[in-house]
Each structure stands twice: as C-alpha cells, then as structure tokens.
Amino acid sequence: MNDKRVFNHVENNAGNEEEVFRVKREFSETAEIIPDLTALDDEREEKQALEGELLASQFEQAVRPRFRWWKRAVIAVAVLFLGATVAQSVQWLIDTWQANQWIYFAFAVVGCSVVGLGLSALGREFLRLRKLRQHLALRAESAVEFKDDFEIDKAKKLCGEITSSLGMDAQHPTVIQWQKQLNDGLTAREVGELFSKNVLYPIDNKAKKLITQSAVENGIVVAISPLAIVDMLFLAWRNTRLINRIANIYGIELGYWSRLRLMRMVFINMAFTGATELVQDIGLDWLSQDITAKLSGRIGQGLGVGLLTARLGIKTMEFCRPLTFNKDEKPRLSHIHRELLTSLKSVVLRSDKSRKKQNV
C-alpha cells in the first residue's frame, strides 16, 4: 500500500512574491488645487538675501570708488596747487612785512586766512569721509562676524566698537541691559540679536518716528501747495535734511562729499529695487488707497510724495545702521502709509470744506 503524501503550501517563496494592491486614486475635474508656497517663500528669502548682499556691495563701491590713473593725476595736481598757494601766501606775508608795506600786508593776512579756512574745511571733509568709510567697514564686518560659527569674544568686541561709534559708553543704560543678558551659552548670532534689540532698538524707533513725521509733513505740504516749483525746492531741501538727521541719529556726521556719496547710493538703490519692492512693502492695501486717492488729485499727489520720502528715509536708515536688519526688524512702508493717508484725508478734506464755506 502506497504511503499518503502531504504537500505544504509555502506562502512566501523565494520565487513567488506577494502582489501588493494599492488604493485607487480618483481625480475630480472641479477640485480646487492648492499649491504649496513653501518653495516660493524659500526662493523669495534667498532672493532677498542675495539682493541684500548686492546692495551692500553697491554701497561699498559707491563709498569706495576705484582710483584710476586720471583720478590720481587730478588729486596730485590739486595737492600741488594747494601747496603752491600756501607757500605763495606765506611768502607774500613775509615780503610785505619786511618791506613795511602795510596795505599789502593786510591783503596778505586776508589771503592767508582764506587759505587756512579752505584747508581746514578740506580737512574736516576728509575726516568725515574717513568716518563714513570706517562705518562701512564696521557694517561689512558685522555682517560676517555675527554668525553661529564665529567666536563670541569677537562679536562682543565688535559690539563695543559699534557702541563707541554711536557715541555711547559702557555705562549707558541700554548697554548695561545688553551686558546683563549675555552668558557663555550664547552664539555670536544671538549676541548680535540681543545687541540689536537692546541697544539699537531705541535708535531705530527714533529714526522711524522721524521718517514718519517727514513723510506726513511733505505729503501735506504738496497736497496743499498749488505751485509745483515751490514743491520741488521744498522736497529737495526736506529730503536732504532728512538724510542728514538720520545719519546723525546713528552717529555719522556727513560732509559735502560724504553726503553726496550716501545720497548717490540711496538713489541708486531705490532705482534698482523699483516698483517691485514698493508693492511688496505696501501689499494689497494699496488698492484701497488708490481708490481713495482717486477721490482727490491732491490726496494722490501728497500720498505719492509722502511714500517717496518714507522710502528714501528707510533706505538711508538701512545704510546708516551699523548692523543689517533682520527679517522682522526691517521697517516697511506699510507701517507709515496708513498714518500718511489718514493725515492727508483729514487736512485736504478740511481745507475743501473751508473753501466751500467761504464761497457760499
């Protein structure tokens, strides 16, 4: 009799693989597609970082222009001319004194005084320009030093140099408050952030208030004034004064040439950024403001001039600040445009009502 044979079924053989079933996906034609904007935000942040580095390099090129051979030749000729003028003035003074020609001696004294005043003015301009270059170098160094992989001692030393450039000593209340928050567990970047929040934050608020005040005043004057030439001259004077006052807030004393170079960099930066940054700063609120501005041409003019003044002040503030702004610290036009629009509407509409009453 044959033996019974039993066959066992092996489910997981080396030659047989288990078939995997997946859930069927169905797509609706009317379903709303919500894109993932995370990649776009990251790309925008990278673009802003690259743009900031580009603007910093442009500012450095504006303050430190390249010396070409013809510039060196002009400087050499100017130095020789000044030296010859000083030598001739001194020689004229000595000759008239020895010859007892008192009238010519008086003219020689006046000439030497004028030459001395000119040399002192040139010396002050050179010192102010040098201070602006030192501020630029300090700002560029702070952009590199305040990173996680740098030493804390270097970051603290750099903060001390920035404090000295701002005209503060170690006993200043904000500096003492910053020093109390320091400990060995902090990184260089965190040291810079604490310094910015404690020491630079009050200075930033002062500059922001000045920018808002200037923007509102310029917008109101342009909205009320009927003369375009007067508006242009007024804005040129006010904007130049705004740049000087912001620079003084951050401890920078501008001379003639340093002021021209700073203004040049600010205007170049404003031209490069253009309307794109303006729309990003203001956002969708611009649409409602535009509709309101269409109700009155004067409100529209005042709004445009006020925003231009505010943008000029913000760019000057960015270049004069010894530390670069973080993403949350950077001032934006959206912080100013509401107050500007409210002030313009109240002033212009009030003037319109008064004129109607006078006509009646």
UniProtKB/Swiss-Prot annotation:
<feature type="transmembrane region" description="Helical">
    <location>
        <begin position="102"/>
        <end position="122"/>
    </location>
</feature>
<keyword id="KW-1003">Cell membrane</keyword>
<feature type="transmembrane region" description="Helical">
    <location>
        <begin position="74"/>
        <end position="94"/>
    </location>
</feature>
<dbReference type="InterPro" id="IPR021147">
    <property type="entry name" value="DUF697"/>
</dbReference>
<protein>
    <recommendedName>
        <fullName>UPF0283 membrane protein Asuc_0957</fullName>
    </recommendedName>
</protein>
<keyword id="KW-0472">Membrane</keyword>
<dbReference type="Pfam" id="PF05128">
    <property type="entry name" value="DUF697"/>
</dbReference>
<comment type="similarity">
    <text>Belongs to the UPF0283 family.</text>
</comment>
<keyword id="KW-0997">Cell inner membrane</keyword>
<feature type="transmembrane region" description="Helical">
    <location>
        <begin position="215"/>
        <end position="235"/>
    </location>
</feature>
<keyword id="KW-0812">Transmembrane</keyword>
<dbReference type="InterPro" id="IPR006507">
    <property type="entry name" value="UPF0283"/>
</dbReference>
<dbReference type="GO" id="GO:0005886">
    <property type="term" value="C:plasma membrane"/>
</dbReference>
<keyword id="KW-1133">Transmembrane helix</keyword>
